[in-house]
Amino acid sequence: MTQKTIQQVPRQGLELLASTQDLAQLCYIYGEPAEGEDSTADESIINTPQCSTIPEVAVEPEVQPIPDTPLTAIFIIRALVARKLRRSETEIDPSRSIKELCGGKSTLQNELIGELGNEFQTSLPDRAEDVSLADLDAALGEVSLGPTSVSLLQRVFTAKMPARMTVSNVRERLAEIWGLGFHRQTAVLVAALAAEPHSRLTSLEAAYQYWDGLTEAYGQSLGLFLRKAISQQAARSDDQGAQAIAPADSLGSKDLARKQYEALREYLGIRTPTTKQDGLDLADLQQKLDCWTAEFSDDFLSQISRRFDARKTRWYRDWWNSARQELLTICQNSNVQWTDKMREHFVQRAEEGLVEIARAHSLAKPLVPDLIQAISLPPVVRLGRLATMMPRTVVTLKGEIQCEEHEREPSCFVEFFSSWIQANNIRCTIQSNGEDLTSVFINSLVHASQQGVSFANHTYLITGAGPGSIGQHIVRRLLTGGARVIVTTSREPLPAAAFFKELYSKCGNRGSQLHLVPFNQASVVDCERLIGYIYDDLGLDLDAILPFAATSQVGAEIDGLDASNEAAFRLMLVNVLRLVGFVVSQKRRRGISCRPTQVVLPLSPNHGILGGDGLYAESKRGLETLIQRFHSESWKEELSICGVSIGWTRSTGLMAANDLVAETAEKQGRVLTFSVDEMGDLISLLLTPQLATRCEDAPVMADFSGNLSCWRDASAQLAAARASLRERADTARALAQEDEREYRCRRAGSTQEPVDQRVSLHLGFPSLPEYDPLLHPDLVPADAVVVVGFAELGPWGSARIRWEMESRGCLSPAGYVETAWLMNLIRHVDNVNYVGWVDGEDGKPVADADIPKRYGERILSNAGIRSLPSDNREVFQEIVLEQDLPSFETTRENAEALQQRHGDMVQVSTLKNGLCLVQLQHGATIRVPKSIMSPPGVAGQLPTGWSPERYGIPAEIVQQVDPVALVLLCCVAEAFYSAGISDPMEIFEHIHLSELGNFVGSSMGGVVNTRALYHDVCLDKDVQSDALQETYLNTAPAWVNMLYLGAAGPIKTPVGACATALESVDSAVESIKAGQTKICLVGGYDDLQPEESAGFARMKATVSVRDEQARGREPGEMSRPTAASRSGFVESQGCGVQLLCRGDVALAMGLPIYGIIAGTGMASDGIGRSVPAPGQGILTFAQEDAQNPAPIRTALARWGLGIDDITVASLHATSTPANDTNEPLVIQREMTHLGRTSGRPLWAICQKFVTGHPKAPAAAWMLNGCLQVLDTGLVPGNRNADDVDPALRSFSHLCFPIRSIQTDGIKAFLLNSCGFGQKEAQLVGVHPRYFLGLLSEPEFEEYRTRRQLRIAGAERAYISAMMTNSIVCVQSHPPFGPAEMHSILLDPSARICLDSSTNSYRVTKASTPVYTGFQRPHDKREDPRPSTIGVDTVTLSSFNAHENAIFLQRNYTERERQSLQLQSHRSFRSAVASGWCAKEAVFKCLQTVSKGAGAAMSEIEIVRVQGAPSVLHGDALAAAQKAGLDNIQLSLSYGDDCVVAVALGVRKWCLWPLASIIR
């Protein structure tokens, strides 16, 4: 077959094609030939070669068209309604009206009617929202797409479809593949409005599947049989494509493509990726790698990998804080008996703050002289004073082999060791250059055990000091002696840090420091960098090195040596030499030749004695060569050598497996085995100056082998001992199993089944203190504001779970169950077959006892402070087009908008279907989205799986309301349960609707909707129409009132940034005391949002997660208040609320009382330029002079307390460098100014170490924690404060506990809060027992009964609601009808009660009469002001009459004297003085004729009525009646050294209370 050449092809005219106009021709896209047109090619143009015949593919015939029907309104109506309500079309019932579908929400109804009116461009029927959708469809009839649906449909294609997917494409596919007519196509398109994809479809295939699914759903809804087919065009296109592609795979085409590539590469100057030389190099590298792997293996490489990183170093220097904490803890217990060991422990930590504490506590006063004397002396450690132990191996009845230890004789290690050396005639235990130093060593040991030795001002490096090791005990001894110790660890930072932090807090004495450094001694690089860090970065010089790092090689004999044994040899020998060599280099570089560093070599008598230990013996033998090198090499000026032959040391990492046969070694081998403590003391003694200086002249050898090297047949005897133990254990185990089988047989007839232990869930009501007749504050219940309920939702879920983690660091079984429920891991079922918890996913039963084991890890990893999900932040970059873009379809409105923005740089042409074809041309500017990788984030997030539906909130509300408002709603419901109120409507049986206030605030409000309003709108995304309202800070409290409370009281929304919650309490207290409200909801709420987090990061306020990760910090460690390494706060989200109540209302309702709000104060910080800078304006809360006592003092004095009675201070403590020093400074100055006793520091609570910083609810969570502290007496410690900042040491009025402290009770607390924008606030809280002291004993018992009934019912209701997912009972309508609303709001006596017979609410009247004391203007009454007043004051320090029995007999009645006898010795003087002051004030008030200064005052009797002082008894009553007085109101106020009484005579027509007169 001949082929025509190019020259033979007839020439055609030159045709120029453009991609913008001739895209179809350029891409060889052909349409269907017109009917009747000859589709054969014109062979006269080009004679193409003949190809082999391709078999014709059987193509399925085109689908038969389905008869088209006009589009009716119901399709569009259902789609728009479903889209607005966020439901599927199948959930929209055409028989229901818009009003019914919207649940009566007027906003949604209004929006839908507006959209439908705009869509159909015609007048809708009257009250269209009340008409069913079917009737609305009948009224509108046949329709077409309107403006609303076209706009929404265009948005779907723009935002969710892939590129080049247009309406026209979809219509073509629906016609070709599905055979749908134009109107049916429109119906499918409309269905997309209610089933919009969640995100953009990434491919055309995914888009086709999406539209095919909608088409199938459309057919099913109409009962149509739709059949998908392949069109002839598609089939032909596939065939032609296959033919077109086939030649491309030919050899000639590939060769041409390769030549083109080479030409372009050469022209552009691009280097060939690989050359022959590169290939040779790669082969050589591969050969070397194979050789390395064959010789050492991958395990060897991993074992020598580098670990050292100076950024991950942990420092511990806060010995002073640990000492203060321990002494204060001991002083809490009056039954403590001081021992010599306890005394010495504190003497070695003596410092000025500790002396003050000892002076202030009678229990510790005997320590004061010793502490003062020890301040100027270095700390010492007494070595060898421990009890010596011997091993015992026992086989239990169950066949378990256990190792025990018993005391030797003599029990003191010094005495025993000395006698053992003499008894065994052992010589040269310690020798140097042939000289026997054994006696010197023993004498030194005796001296160290009696007088102690000091390691102060010395620096030691110890490797291999893990838990249970000899090195770990040496570290303890060195820290006790005041040394600076650098310890290395190869473990992960967190577990190692926790261990050494605890070790330092127990053993660190005055001046000691502990540095924990990550390090792998098997790495040469690590060895060099470690020594460089010590000498270059820290600027230290080592006094001694103890390279004790080792690794176990048990079971490795010479025929099984592998890479791990080689790595161990490198670690224990080769790199020990390198390590000390690097020290020599550093010393020589610095010219240090007069202070040689002592190297303590860990030698061993085990030179193959035990066997099966790899290269252990060889590495120990190799170290011995340093003793000879000392004389033969040149580094004796820089190093001194001390070799220690370490004997059998029980329970270490290397010898733990041999503990079972240690008794055999002592009995049969006459070997002395040592405990870790004993061996540690012996080695520590070698570091003392007396023995260390001996090493400078010649190496010292210490033989602590315990005769192990003399045991010749050790291996065989030990093997026999192990076999004997196994035999005994097998025998005992067999007998135990036989006994168990016999026991089961005896019980086989019993039908009793074991009962699974169930976990009891509780709300956590406060314990009720016993009645105390000695507590009688001069107040009435109505004067008090108390906390009757509280709740929170935060990173740990509820306040109960947060308290467990804060105070204990772990969850209780009930805590696991509650958190698993909250995270949707379990759910409760109650049916015929099973009652209990089941798995949230598979529904299988889960026993209560199995929940911690099954879900514990998931709970702890998905709650608290943890890493945020990675998120790419979307930003836009503006680009100027350099060439025209391809055209795209869009609506006319969009086309006009684009033309208005870009002008002549956009070309618009109208299509027949009403859409427009738009092309952006060169020169136009567009913004292209790009993703910026957000830095890693950490925050305190709500537990994973938390959802408002779990609490019973309906789905339609969840979709409408901002997420943070839902958190607040759930939190408020829990707060009412914690108050014993399961139905908030119960409140209105006791108070009016207007007397319940809502003071919950926020700093940011609904940030999700704020982001949508300002960010999503710019992206033309679909934004909820009522998003604006959700951004207001008062909207969330409004939702609480609308959906749950239904009150008519004030909603005041404080905005105080991080101090919002405390500002909320301050406002509520003012409202209650002013009589505006009786119960108030207070607190704060805030959410997390990326933009906000980025703003904090730019301010350098939050922690840099990347830096923290580089320092080896886990997310849970990154919030470290008061720690020297703190670097910023960690954000968190959530809500916290409290329910405040007037005291008399709380008593009447029987509400639980968690605490008293004794006083609050707020202040600002004056002139400045920094909004977030912490200030000291709150010092005004402590301002006072001789005439005006401080607000703090006054708040405490009302309850009979003084400034020394404050026990704890809850600090704002955000973990920022500035705040955590400024805040303690403020409190220090306040306490000093108010005269707090030195040596009685406040326990500082830093809650944010476990919660992070939630902004607005911060103080609410802190207040919840303080209330829990009041109830339990447990002060939670700040476990993340690994090294309390030395700058805080001077604040002697504060102690910063790092572990929880159980006190004997808390009387009062101080809460401090700070917020951006000069918000400073403080709160004083008092224990509820002082409020209950206002009651008489019968009143107390009556309250106890009411309270018990209430909390029992609330506990049952809460657990039931939790198990049925109905904690939040959303109110759908008010408890009264519209006709009653006005009368209820206008009548202050209106109350709402639940009628139990009908289970409905009814309106009643209050039992107390309505106040009608206001007089009309024409009433002729005298001026209603009090006619008489009397004031008197008594100075307590000069009042001594209480010691005079005659004075008491003449001036106090029998009843008054009985009351005085109940007072304690301390308060007796104050009680007598206040009574006398009150009598004098009453006498002046009566204005009667005086009988003289010496007249008895017993005729004026002061008694208590409901806790308040009352008069008008005896002759005083007659005098008052004669003066026309109805009663005398008496007020007593207390200062530090004075009492003031004010008596007001009130006439019968005067109805104003004393408080209003004073104002």
Swiss-Prot record:
Keyword line: Fatty acid biosynthesis, Fatty acid metabolism, Lipid biosynthesis, Lipid metabolism, Magnesium, Metal-binding, Multifunctional enzyme, NADP, Oxidoreductase, Phosphopantetheine, Phosphoprotein, Transferase, Virulence
Binding site for acetyl-CoA: 1432-1434, 1480-1490, 1504-1506, 1532-1534
Changes seen on gene knockout: Fails to produce sterigmatocystin under conditions that supports production by wild-type. Able to grow without exogenous long-chain fatty acids.
Catalytic activity of the protein: acetyl-CoA + n malonyl-CoA + 2n NADPH + 4n H(+) = a long-chain-acyl-CoA + n CoA + n CO2 + 2n NADP(+); a fatty acyl-[ACP] + malonyl-[ACP] + H(+) = a 3-oxoacyl-[ACP] + holo-[ACP] + CO2; a (3R)-hydroxyacyl-[ACP] + NADP(+) = a 3-oxoacyl-[ACP] + NADPH + H(+)
Residues covered by region (Ketoreductase (KR) domain): 457-693
Induction info: The genes forming the sterigmatocystin biosynthesis cluster are co-regulated and induced on oatmeal porridge or the fungal isolates were grown either on oatmeal porridge or in YEC medium (0.2% yeast extract, 5.0% corn steep liquor). Expression is positively regulated by the cluster-specific transcription factor aflR that binds the palindromic sequence 5'-TCG(N5)CGA-3'found in the promoter.
Active-site residues, Swiss-Prot/TrEMBL: C1058 (for beta-ketoacyl synthase activity), H1212 (for beta-ketoacyl synthase activity), H1253 (for beta-ketoacyl synthase activity)
Amino acid composition bias (Basic and acidic residues), ranges on this chain: 1105-1117
Function: Fatty acid synthase alpha subunit; part of the gene cluster that mediates the biosynthesis of sterigmatocystin (ST), a polyketide-derived furanocoumarin which is part of the most toxic and carcinogenic compounds among the known mycotoxins. The first step in the biosynthesis of sterigmatocystin is the production of hexanoate by the fatty acid synthase (FAS) units stcJ and stcK. The polyketide backbone is assembled by the non-reducing polyketide synthase stcA by condensation of the starter hexanoyl-CoA and 7 malonyl-CoA extender units followed by cyclization and release of norsolorinic acid.
Family under the similarity heading: Belongs to the thiolase-like superfamily. Fungal fatty acid synthetase subunit alpha family.
PANTHER family in the cross-refs: FATTY ACID SYNTHASE SUBUNIT BETA (PTHR10982:SF21), MALONYL COA-ACYL CARRIER PROTEIN TRANSACYLASE (PTHR10982)
Name of the protein: Fatty acid synthase alpha subunit stcJ
Organism, as annotated: Emericella nidulans (strain FGSC A4 / ATCC 38163 / CBS 112.46 / NRRL 194 / M139)
Gene behind the chain: stcJ
